């Protein structure tokens, strides 16, 4: 899974220290005073007072985690946020079920689809900026009922990420345990860690993500060279391997069924990447941000996924008995006879798994606020504290994480498969509808005779890329249906086997069926689609008119005496003559990779 903070511009200046907003009070005259602000101090009581909920009728915009992060946080998170459980853990099971050939083909197809998705979303988000969630476009451009079902599915996807990551963390810890310990112990420890990180706000989250992203990038780069050394036969153990494992035991396993089985784990690995397009489309310069975002995704998919997975297939055969239980990274290093590095790698994997869980808490709360704004969720989910943090949705995310305690049961390991099915299978529904939204936008513009020249960002042939995306997601859903009915394990068809593979789309269908109870069905033609509210060019023209009127007023004030002090003038001169700061080494690395 991918973090929301990854697509913030890397050259952004450091934000000020967060402020605590004190609720408005009534003074002696009976009038209501405005909110007063005071700096967050070191007072222990102020920390707890900041969590006091605002009145029920007061809702505020959720403070993005980027608002209080330093540039070094944003730079490192942007590089390493795409690396997580999908790459470190899930690829082992996919390699075991499908073989190296199916694994590579599947990831290449989905990576190309993700690039098309970033372009389509970027085009939509530039034209109709949206600060909440990508699912808001479906209700506006397509249908309210479908938008309702998609939004709730997306909320559940992020809500299930935290317990799935904690379940995966329990499996990672098993690498060290020589004696069987109750998994509930580890679940409690990991859950307490997530609570502490989120309790201290965005700064603590940023520090933890900075460290974890740095470690993830370092371990992937180390594995890149170690895998080449092992493959060439220069490791302490083993000889030259080359492409031997692609021939013996082979490139494909379980045929077409094996290929179809990889879709869930691949989607689970890549889900969340779509938020890069949303964030880039909401920047002040989308014409520059969107190409940068596409280049960023291209490099990540190419290096951190395609090349890394290819190296895994070269040094780990699909018939290795440890696959599915141990990370393929660790299996490869152990097979090479390297003794210390497996423990270091496993520790980094544990940190990366928990970091994805931290990011999921932020993402789930953001989608909860989007549901409340649309009137599709209970208002209590939108309650915020004095600093604008969605405390209730945070608590819902943490409460959902308690599902991970099921790992203490004898068959508790299947919980991770169920939770991954919601994220993996549901991602195809989210992506497919996003492509349909983009196609709908283009046809609505034609029906309303809006030229495409008004688009702040336009990619040639983007509509055809959206058709490609719809086709890939439709075929992926068909593959999930096929593998749900006819499992890759050659078992007889069962309800359990069906829902463990098709749970995400099933959640969408369930919400779609009950949507008429909560949402009035709307069937709008292309000419009736709202393409004016919040539109980029219209908002900018209104701002231009406002600025013009302001400038006319300021011209009248030119005849008035200038009351500005010389000290202020001197300070402004100093600021204007200040040379630009040189980029740090970390900024240069980020610019190269991103």
UniProtKB/Swiss-Prot annotation:
It is found in: Membrane. It comes from the Eukaryota. It is a multi-pass membrane protein. Keywords: Amino-acid transport, Membrane, Transmembrane, Transmembrane helix, Transport. One of its GO terms (biological process) is amino acid transmembrane transport. InterPro entries: AA-permease/SLC12A_dom (IPR004841), Amino_acid_permease_CS (IPR004840), APC_YAT (IPR050524). The keyword Cytoplasm does not apply. Its main location: membrane. GO terms for molecular function: amino acid transmembrane transporter activity; mechanosensitive monoatomic cation channel activity. The chain crosses the membrane at residues 75-95, 101-121, 146-166, 181-201, 210-230, 297-317, 323-343, 344-364, 390-410, 416-436, 468-488, 498-518. Pfam families: AA_permease. Residues 550-587 are annotated as: Disordered. GO terms for cellular component: fungal-type vacuole; membrane; plasma membrane. Belongs to the amino acid-polyamine-organocation (APC) superfamily. This is Amino-acid permease 1. It comes from Schizosaccharomyces pombe (strain 972 / ATCC 24843).
């Amino acid at each position: 899974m991918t973090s929301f903070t990854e697509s913030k511009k890397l050259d952004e200046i450091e934000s000020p220290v967060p402020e605590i907003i004190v609720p408005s009070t009534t003074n002696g005259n009976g009038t209501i005073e405005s909110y007063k602000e005071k700096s967050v101090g070191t007072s222990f009581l102020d920390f707890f007072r900041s969590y006091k909920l605002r009145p029920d009728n007061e809702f505020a915009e959720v403070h993005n985690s980027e608002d209080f992060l330093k540039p070094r946080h944003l730079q490192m998170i942007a590089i390493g946020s795409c690396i997580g459980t999908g790459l470190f853990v899930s690829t082992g099971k996919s390699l075991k079920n499908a073989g190296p050939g199916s694994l590579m083909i599947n990831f290449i197809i989905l990576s190309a689809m993700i690039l098309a998705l970033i372009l389509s979303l970027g085009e939509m988000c530039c034209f109709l900026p949206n600060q909440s969630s990508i699912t808001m476009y479906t209700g506006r451009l397509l249908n309210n009922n479908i938008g309702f079902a998609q939004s709730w599915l997306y909320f559940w996807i992020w809500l299930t990420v935290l317990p799935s990551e904690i379940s995966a963390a329990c499996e990672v810890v098993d690498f060290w345990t020589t004696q069987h310990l109750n998994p509930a112990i580890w679940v409690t420890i990991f859950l307490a860690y997530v609570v502490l990180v989120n309790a201290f706000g965005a700064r603590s989250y940023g520090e933890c993500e900075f460290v974890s992203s740095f470690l993830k990038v370092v371990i992937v780069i180390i594995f890149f060279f170690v895998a080449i050394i092992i493959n060439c036969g220069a490791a302490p153990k083993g000889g030259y391997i080359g492409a031997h494992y692609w021939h013996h035991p082979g490139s494909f396993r379980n045929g077409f069924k094996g290929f179809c089985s990889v879709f869930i784990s691949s989607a689970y690995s890549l889900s969340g990447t779509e938020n890069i397009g949303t964030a880039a489309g909401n920047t002040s310069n989308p014409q520059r941000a969107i190409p940068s975002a596409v280049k960023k995704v291209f490099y990540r998919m190419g290096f951190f996924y395609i090349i890394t997975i290819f190296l895994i297939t070269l040094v780990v055969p699909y018939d290795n008995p440890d696959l599915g239980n141990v990370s393929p990274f660790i299996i490869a290093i152990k097979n090479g006879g390297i003794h210390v590095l497996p423990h270091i790698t496993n520790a980094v994997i544990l940190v990366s798994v928990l970091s994805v869980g931290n990011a999921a808490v932020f993402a789930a709360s953001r989608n909860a606020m989007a549901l409340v704004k649309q009137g599709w969720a209970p208002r209590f989910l939108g309650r915020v504290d004095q600093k604008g943090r969605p405390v209730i949705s945070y608590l819902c995310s943490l409460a959902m994480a308690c599902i991970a305690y099921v790992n203490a049961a004898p068959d508790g390991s299947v919980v991770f498969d169920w939770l991954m099915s919601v994220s993996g299978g549901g991602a195809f529904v989210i992506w497919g509808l996003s492509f349909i939204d983009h196609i709908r936008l283009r046809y609505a513009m034609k029906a309303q005779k809006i030229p495409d020249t008004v688009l702040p960002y336009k990619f040639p042939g983007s509509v055809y890329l959206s058709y490609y995306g719809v086709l890939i997601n439709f075929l992926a859903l068909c593959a999930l249906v096929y593998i749900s009915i006819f499992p890759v394990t050659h078992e007889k068809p069962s309800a359990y086997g069906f829902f463990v593979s098709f749970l995400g789309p099933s959640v969408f269908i369930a919400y779609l069926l009950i949507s008429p109870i909560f949402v009035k069905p709307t069937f709008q033609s292309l000419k009736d689609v709202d393409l004016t509210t919040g539109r980029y060019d219209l908002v900018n023209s209104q701002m231009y008119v406002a600025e013009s009127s302001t400038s006319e007023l300021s011209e009248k004030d030119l005849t008035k005496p200038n009351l500005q002090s010389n000290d202020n003038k001197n300070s402004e001169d100093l600021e204007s003559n200040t040379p630009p700061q040189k980029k740090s080494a970390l900024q240069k690395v980020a610019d190269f990779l991103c």
